[in-house]
Amino acid sequence: MQNTTIAAIATAPGAGGIAVVRLSGPESYAVAARVFHPANPNKNVEEAKGYTALFGSFVEGDDAFDEGVALFFRAPHSYTGEDVVELSCHGGSAVARRLVEACIAAGAAPAAPGEYTRRAFLNGKMSLTQAEAVMDIISADGKQGAALANASLSGALAKKIGTEKEALTGLQAHLAAWVDFPEEDVPELDDAHLHTVLGQVQQELDGLIKNYDAGAVLREGVDCAIVGRPNAGKSTLLNLLAGFDRAIVTPVAGTTRDVVEQAVQLGDIRLNLFDTAGLRETDDAIEAEGIRRSWKKLDEAGLILAVFDGSEPLTREDLALAQRCAGRPAIALVNKEDKPTRFDAEIITGDFAMVIPVCCQEEGSRKVIAAAVARLLGTNQIDPHAASLSGQRQLAAATRARDAVAGALDAVEGGFGLDAVSVCVDDALDALCELTGENASEAVINEVFERFCVGK
């Protein structure tokens, strides 16, 4: 439990129906009593039971400046595990700010970013992975991303890691007894049993790591470069995916000279689109700079949509683009399928994950592209209710644990003795405990909560 009582606006900034100011800490009820007067004079704020609500006025000194509701939560049955009071006022920014100022004048301290969730973690209300899921669910744009975050918030990842820790802990207890007490009649673990336990743990961790990239796409989105020759239909594609005329489209080649950016929601995936200048040889210095930026965006992108004009034969520029896309997460969109085809798609098939005929002027192509992107990025294979890793911290810890388990298996197979196996299992357990936050350093914890906004 923390000694200070904190206050902050817990709802989004700006005008709205209501705003919520949250108090948490040992003096929450006392602070609330100084800024909230119940409409029923027989009600005592400091004696309010948990999970109850009172209607009344918000005051600063003798000035009642708004009416609203106070919700009461008694420790440990609250979000933070502390005494909590949530004050719901009208949603104007000025009213909410004044209510926070009144709380601070009444003895509360301003909350730091993420301090409520940090207290929930420190008070044992949630694991570190669940705390990270809070931020993921706040920032989720799509249904699947929100479902993944909710699964972690509900403890799916913590439970899965707990299962693997339990298996390794049981193994380590037996190994430690055999190594540390040789005079006792402790049966030696046979290689077959070690292989079975370690192999199962490695398989589970491999599965989490394998699905990380697809999960990250659902949570965070992906940068997507739209590339191709002039007039292939790149800007038309951008407008199709955006749902409005974001880019200028003309029959004049080279209309787009700089990178045009637009974030769109394509199915459950947020694409940060970059419509680039048409790729061709040019003596125009301005256009040449745009083309240089086009190649740079292609090299940096997590997804490439390469647009080809299906009504014209392949050109040298088309082939150069295809070669640049080889081995990358790239989809070839052969545009203008509504016109007679003169494009030999077989020539570039080996350079792309998929080659798809589309018409960027038709709404139906949007669904086709969305399905192709989901297949390529693997998001259509993700179970949104299963355990998943979120963020580089969790991925790094899971990878260290997997590598340590692999080292233990190598020690078994190499006949290095149970001492070597025990050291590797210890390393794996340390990594898993860091993942869940059980032995995370103060620096790691600070890094996690730095991502949070004030009020959460």
Task: Report residues per predicted region.
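Short glycine-/polar-rich loops that comprise or flank the Walker A/P-loop
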Residues: 16-18, 51-53, 300-304, 327-330, ...
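Switch I (G2) and immediately adjacent beta-strands of P-loop GTPase domains
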Residues: 54-66, 70-74, 254-282, 300-303
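C-terminal-of-GTPase-core extension/linker across diverse P-loop GTPases
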Residues: 2-9, 13, 143-265, 282-284, ...
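Inter-motif core of Ras-like GTPase G domains
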Residues: 287-311
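Short glycine-/small-residue-rich Rossmann-like dinucleotide-binding loops
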Residues: 242, 277-278, 302, 309-310, ...
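A glycine-rich (often HGG/GG-containing) alpha/beta subdomain
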Residues: 1-147, 151, 155, 331
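Conserved beta-strand segments of alpha/beta enzyme cores
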Residues: 109, 270-272, 354
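Generic enzyme active-site microenvironment
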Residues: 273, 307, 333
